[in-house]
Amino acid sequence: MGIASILSNKNITINVDHVIDSDEAMLLAIGYRQELRREFSLWSIFAVSFSVLGLLPSIAACFDYQQLVVGMSPLPWLIAMIFITSVAYSMAEIASAFPCSAGTPYAVSQLAPKKYASFLTWFTCWTNWSCQITAAPSVSYSCACMMLALHSFTDPSFVASNAQIFGLTTGIQVLCAFMACFPTKWVARFSSAGTTCNIVFLVVVFIMILGGNKRDQIKEGISKFNSNSTAWGLDNQAEWPTGLSFLISFMGVIWAMSGYDSPFHLAEKCSNAAVAAPRAIVLTSTVGGLIGFMFMIAIAYTLVDLNQISADPESLGQPFVTYLTQIMDKNLVIGATALTIISSFFMAQNCLLASSRVTYAYARDGLFPLSGIWKKVSPKTQTPINAVIMNFIVEELLLLLIFGGDVSIGSIFSIGALAGFISFTMPTLLKITYARKTFQPGPWNLGKWSEPIGWVSVAFVGLMVPILCFPTVKGADLTPTEMNWTCLVYFGLILLTTIWFVVYARRWYVGPRTNISEEDIVYGEKTEDEGDEIPDVIDGQKVSISSTEKRYQ
């Protein structure tokens, strides 16, 4: 079949007892037995990824990280989007070549030098998992804060405590975890419905911002819209030079746009995965980036007073809601916030869904303690319920950061952006360096643009890794409460897992493991169709896994 995998160079045939299609044949060639039902279409996995992207709630949640850093200008979104799209396109090409739920770590295991493959795979797994495991709690936290902000807006005497925020966030997490355990067909339908709502609500709130804009009536002496110079100008709110602050503001864009990897991790749940998964990645990043940019323009031309949003005079705790109060009547503020809350819930549910499938895939490869428990799939629903439970427990522990204050809990946003970027780009870095002449692209590929786009994405990530660790203040103003704790939390985790690998895990961790039973593998047997294209349906009792040329030494 010409696929590089953990079964490459072994000249084997796999016995099967049922008719299989091209997707299952490719997965067997990669080294995994089909355990999950393929009931997701291109639209379904795009639905999940677009819901994980969650533009409306993401933009609302990231006001602190963009508008309150360099002002209302949409320029940071535009510039960052160009480079983020290059990262996504490079990932799409990787997903087409290795369409399995293990995602980027599996690709790293096949593209890295053999001597370092196990460690680089280990590093990528933990990096990607730290991105995935912080997604759902950060979105659930944002959703809870918006709900409580809406309560404060309607009842000014109400001020939410940390315990109330934690309790409400936990309630959202419980509901999302419960729904992630449903059968795949139900989850697919719910995800599709969630995407429809997210798109509709995004359009509705966009129209409400422009059509319901009454800022000239709410505040005297200003026009209905800002001038071009005001809307596009930079207003440095940080203590760094404007250029550095501009780069720091990319964090909001990176976090808001970080859901495009979901189709990769759902590849084992969709049909025609080698084409559908990369297409969904491209659609998510491109469509999401353009729509988000339009939304940024709407905000730039209507925002009234950044200082008021930063000061939060009504103690709402949500800059986006404070922004809405500057331009809308009370009823419209309530309506727009309510729609954002609903979208945020759909986003949280899909984040937990995608992350649980990542946990399942990594447990299958033995990454975690007690992996034998976490990798089990429910025979009734054919979903990884134990992985959902594990994620829920870890995410609840992360949410205890709520009691440390806004900056502490805010670290899960920046960790997600940093870790995601690193894990997304690792296979691209290997593809354009060590495996430059040996990488065999899948049916969806970038052709002659593969290497240039790959270098652009790697260079951008290399620039942004240290930038994402910068606080917005410096000098005497840099106190523990204002510190950016991303570097400590993320690199602390990586340090601990690296020590674990060197001391113990290197003895047994070899990267992705096949879950195909030895009884079903025949070594040294060649078949006539070895190396042929994968057929749509295979009507036999044997599947030949080509003894592909030894491409990764």
UniProtKB/Swiss-Prot annotation:
The chain crosses the membrane at residues 43-63, 68-88, 133-153, 163-183, 190-210, 240-260, 280-300, 333-353, 397-417, 453-473, 485-505. InterPro entries: AA/rel_permease1. Keywords: Membrane, Transmembrane, Transmembrane helix, Transport. GO terms for molecular function: transmembrane transporter activity. It is found in: Membrane. Signal peptide: none annotated. It comes from the Eukaryota. The keyword Transmembrane helix applies. It is a multi-pass membrane protein. Coiled coil: none annotated. It holds the Pfam family AA_permease_2. GO terms for cellular component: membrane. Belongs to the amino acid-polyamine-organocation (APC) superfamily. PANTHER family: AMINO ACID TRANSPORTER (EUROFUNG) (PTHR45649:SF29), AMINO-ACID PERMEASE BAT1 (PTHR45649). This is Putative polyamine transporter. It comes from Candida albicans. The lineage of its organism: Eukaryota, Fungi, Dikarya, Ascomycota, Saccharomycotina.
